[in-house]
């Protein structure tokens, strides 16, 4: 081999080794250069992610992501990291991650195999399950008992997928958790199938006009969304989440949002972490059991 060509190859190899490990990750490079992290949140997914007093983004997932951001800032040795919040709907959340309008989504997204074809996920921070919200005087307890009923679902949600498996139902698409609960309360739908935690919050909020019934129809690991093309950023998120779990910070944040009165709501959900989440807090890792229809 010509000596000049050998020297050129050697120089190229050395230069490649000298590149920083995050150079191929455009998301992380943008965060470092701009000093800004754009977070997507939901307007009405209490207690996980919702607009609080004055429209301020609040909730369990939002506060966890704020802690993540602080640790990412420290890890990257940034003098400051400005957080910019963008409201996103269930229908558009994956597109907003894909087009870079948001770099992290902190809400109620279920980690599934199909969705991992489009986006990547951080560690699980809550295990939800689809259940039914019905009017207070409705005696039906199971989706299989609904017959030809009108069932509200959010387009693109796992609640929609669960409901589509039940023959005979007329599915009524709604844009949000609040709209689904309102449709049931006003008689425009007979039931609303969605994440149990959001339904429990809506039942408390509506003070006896609606109720959550039946066992869970699924087991769904909820986690933050990141771009599937941002492996370095995803690794940072996962490591920061492990630290939050191991030092007890995540458990304290959970207590604030699930076991104490909700800010601006005046009631507590009184929901201690279940066995799955307790195990995740104790032994955090990136393994996830794909969501299951029961």
How would you label these PLM feature ranges?
Residues 18-21:
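N-terminal signal peptide c-region/cleavage motif recognized by signal peptidases
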């Amino acid at each position: 081999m010509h000596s000049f060509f050998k020297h050129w190859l050697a120089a190229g190899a050395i230069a490649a080794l000298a590149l920083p490990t995050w150079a191929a990750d455009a998301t992380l490079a943008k965060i470092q250069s701009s000093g800004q992290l754009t977070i997507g949140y939901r307007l009405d997914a209490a207690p996980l992610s919702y607009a609080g007093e004055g429209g301020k983004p609040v909730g369990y997932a939002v506060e966890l992501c704020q802690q993540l951001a602080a640790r990412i800032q420290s890890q990257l040795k940034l003098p400051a990291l400005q957080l910019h919040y963008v409201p996103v709907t269930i229908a558009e959340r994956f597109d907003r991650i894909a087009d870079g309008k948001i770099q992290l989504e902190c809400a109620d997204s279920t980690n599934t195999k199909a969705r991992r074809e489009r986006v990547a996920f951080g560690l699980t921070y809550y295990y939800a399950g689809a259940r039914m919200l019905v009017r207070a005087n409705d005696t039906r307890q199971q989706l299989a008992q609904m017959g030809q009923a009108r069932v509200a679902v959010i387009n693109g949600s796992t609640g929609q997928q669960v409901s589509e498996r039940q023959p005979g139902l007329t599915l009524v698409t709604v844009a949000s958790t609040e709209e689904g609960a309102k449709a049931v309360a006003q008689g425009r739908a007979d039931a609303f199938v969605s994440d149990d935690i959001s339904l429990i919050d809506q039942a408390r909020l509506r003070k006896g006009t609606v109720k959550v019934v039946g066992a869970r129809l699924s087991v769904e690991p909820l986690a933050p969304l990141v771009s599937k093309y941002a492996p370095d950023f995803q690794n940072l998120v996962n490591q920061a989440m492990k630290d939050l779990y191991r030092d007890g910070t995540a458990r304290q944040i959970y207590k604030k949002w699930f076991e104490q009165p909700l800010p601006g709501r005046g009631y507590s959900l009184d929901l201690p972490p279940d066995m799955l989440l307790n195990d995740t807090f104790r032994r955090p890792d990136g393994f996830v059991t794909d969501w299951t229809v029961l």
